[in-house]
Structure formats: structure tokens, C-alpha cells
Curated annotation (Swiss-Prot):
It is an enzyme of class 3 (hydrolase). The active site is at residue 75. This is dTTP/UTP pyrophosphatase. It is found in: Cytoplasm. Gene3D superfamilies: 3.90.950.10. Its cofactor is a divalent metal cation.
Length: 192
């Protein structure tokens, strides 16, 4: 019996790029789910629940594989205090998010799920990031240049312009990009 196939059920090019660093062959799969946060649950519970919903959606779309397919999904949000920052709806929301995140620390939460038949691994990884102050013009330039509308918190830590404003990071860099690679690899070993 060969090794199971790995499917990254995500439309994120950043997650695809991160997972490719492992040199493990995988396929990607686009799925559509509602990413609804439950205000009565913790941030960790929310991102893990959304990642699980994505995995279950992907599993429902795949033919039965007799335990030969591992599905990987993830969900990322940014939070400062009790405020959660998802993906911005447009320029104004992106501007407001970056304005409020600058010059103070915030946390990036990524929940990920590995699913294969009846075996499920769920985990949430948290990284603290602190941004330098940014002028209104610097924020505008960043948004117009990088168009961060598909990124939680309105920024990509990997974006060249953002490198100028990262004061401190505590935890996993790849988590901030969208997939905590070291934790995913550790969990993946139990499936292979």
C-alpha cells in the first residue's frame, strides 16, 4: 500500500507556497465555505472550527479513497484585544485595519486541520506581531501597491513593503503568512 495522497483544500497561493517547502507532493483543491465567526466561542475555537468545516466540505467533494487521501485546511485571523480582523472588504476597511494595528502588538491565529478517514488532527497556532508606526501616506502606498484584500488584518508579512514595518515577531513566521509549517509537518508525520 502506497503513501496517502495529500490535498491542500485552499485557494491561498501563500499556503500552497508554504506547503511546497516540504517537498511532499500534494494537490490543491478550491472549496467554498462560509467563514462565520461565533461570538460565543474563543478565537482559537473559531479558526479551528472553520478549518474543520473546510476539511469536511472538501471530503464531501472527493470520492471515497479508502484512507488514501489526507486533506489539509486552515483558517487565519488577526486579533488585537477582543477585536478580530478578517479580510478587508475594500480600501477603506484595509486602511482602518492597518491604522489600528500599527505601533502596537496583535496576534495572528491559524487553525489547521488534517483529515483522513476517521482520523482528525486539529490545532491552533498563535504568533504575536508588532508593527512600526505608519503614516497615512505609507498605509495608502502599501494598500495600493500590495492590494491586501485577501489577507487577514490587511497585510502580508511577506510583502516587500511590509518588511519596513515589522518591529517584532514572536512565534512562527509561516503562521502569519497563513500556515504554521513546523506544526503541520509534525502533525502530518502521524498520518504518513
Amino acid at each position: 500500500m502506497g503513501k496517502p495522497a495529500l490535498i491542500l483544500a485552499s485557494q491561498s497561493p501563500r499556503r500552497r507556497d508554504i506547503l511546497s517547502l516540504t517537498l511532499i507532493p500534494f494537490e490543491t483543491m478550491a472549496i467554498e465555505t462560509r467563514e462565520t465567526l461565533d461570538p460565543t466561542s474563543s478565537i482559537e475555537e473559531n479558526v479551528t472550527k472553520i478549518a474543520l468545516e473546510k476539511a469536511e466540505c472538501a471530503a464531501a467533494l472527493l470520492p471515497k479513497q479508502n484512507g488514501k487521501t489526507i486533506i489539509l485546511t486552515a483558517d487565519t485571523v488577526v486579533a488585537k484585544g477582543n477585536r478580530i480582523y478578517g479580510k478587508p472588504a475594500g480600501f477603506d476597511e484595509a486602511f482602518e485595519m492597518l491604522k489600528s494595528l500599527q505601533n502596537r502588538s496583535h496576534r495572528v491565529y491559524t487553525g489547521f486541520v488534517l483529515l483522513c478517514c476517521d482520523k482528525i488532527h486539529t490545532e491552533c497556532v498563535t504568533t504575536t506581531v508588532e508593527l512600526e508606526p505608519m503614516s497615512d501616506n505609507e498605509i495608502k502606498r502599501y494598500i495600493l501597491s500590495e492590494k491586501p484584500y485577501d489577507k487577514a488584518g490587511s497585510y502580508g508579512i511577506q510583502d516587500p513593503l511590509m518588511a519596513c514595518y515589522i518591529r517584532r515577531i514572536e512565534g512562527c513566521y509561516h503562521n502569519v503568512v497563513g500556515l504554521p509549517l513546523s506544526r503541520v509537518c509534525k502533525a502530518l508525520k502521524t498520518f504518513l
